[in-house]
Amino acid sequence: MNLNSIPAFQDNYIWVLTNDEGRCVIVDPGEAAPVLKAIAEHKWMPEAIFLTHHHHDHVGGVKELLQHFPQMTVYGPAETQDKGATHLVGDGDTIRVLGEKFTLFATPGHTLGHVFYFSHPYLFCGDTLFSGGCGRLFEGTPSQMYQSLMKINSLPDDTLICCAHEYTLANIKFALSILPHDSFINEYYRKVKELRVKKQMTLPVILKNERKINLFLRTENIDLINEINKETILQQPEARFAWLRSKKDTF
């Protein structure tokens, strides 16, 4: 399997997974034009679309792509049914695409019906997890989002996290505002800054490394707990997550 990314809008990535024959699955096509261009250039043969949630920048290109490739199966949670999904999927479902098995996990938080798709090592997590951060809580609760992130955190170390947005630099700046002396975060900041100066993408990322720099995956970390305790004593990791998310919302 080969992983490809297509830039879209200002900071979106549309992921395309292809096999050796050129058959492919397209993840969260927010717009059709760049996808159609890439398909023509690479002579890909689209078989399916994966949708993680209903937001327009993830589903806006579905109907046009179906006009060009009506044979495609469009998988998505119930909230995407009116966005072009032809096969509804949910927590615990498994589907076989390109000869590979993908497992679905419900990840409410960013939206209530959000899901991610996992076929080792590939994780297509939509707007649940970003490198150095996580999605805003437009519909769900902090508790829901925390539990969703813990599902990701329980995956194998070598999981390849395919986030949907290039938010890494801003997220790491936030992390440094909380833990300015953290060696892992500082090293990652230098690396990410250099990549972005060159206009190179910072994704995908490996989960083992992400655990070191993403505060939202480090709510049990003693340094972070000590920093939060300077402002308020929070005993539960979910409460510490909510504190972090609130700080990020106003950063």
UniProtKB/Swiss-Prot annotation:
InterPro entries, alphabetized: Clx_II_MBL, Glyoxalase_II_hydrolase, HAGH_C, Hydroxyacylglutathione_Hdrlase, Metallo-B-lactamas, RibonucZ/Hydroxyglut_hydro
Claim: Hydrolase is one of the keywords in the record: yes
Keywords (A to Z) from UniProt: Hydrolase, Metal-binding, Zinc
Residues reported to bind Zn(2+) 2: D57, H58, D127, H165
Cofactor or coenzyme needed: Zn(2+)
One Gene Ontology MF term: metal ion binding
Gene Ontology BP terms: methylglyoxal catabolic process to D-lactate via S-lactoyl-glutathione
Alphabetical list of Pfam families matching this protein: HAGH_C, Lactamase_B
Binding-site residues for Zn(2+) 1, renumbered to this chain: H53, H55, H110, D127
Pathway connected to this protein: Secondary metabolite metabolism; methylglyoxal degradation; (R)-lactate from methylglyoxal: step 2/2
Superkingdom of source: Bacteria
Cofactor: binding comment: Binds 2 Zn(2+) ions per subunit.
Catalytic activity: an S-(2-hydroxyacyl)glutathione + H2O = a 2-hydroxy carboxylate + glutathione + H(+)
EC number assigned by the record: 3.1.2.6
Subunit structure: Monomer.
Sequence similarity: Belongs to the metallo-beta-lactamase superfamily. Glyoxalase II family.
Protein role: Thiolesterase that catalyzes the hydrolysis of S-D-lactoyl-glutathione to form glutathione and D-lactic acid.
Protein name: Hydroxyacylglutathione hydrolase
Naturally occurring in which organism (per UniProt): Salmonella paratyphi C (strain RKS4594)
Taxonomic lineage of the native organism: Bacteria, Pseudomonadati, Pseudomonadota, Gammaproteobacteria, Enterobacterales
Recorded name of the encoding gene: gloB
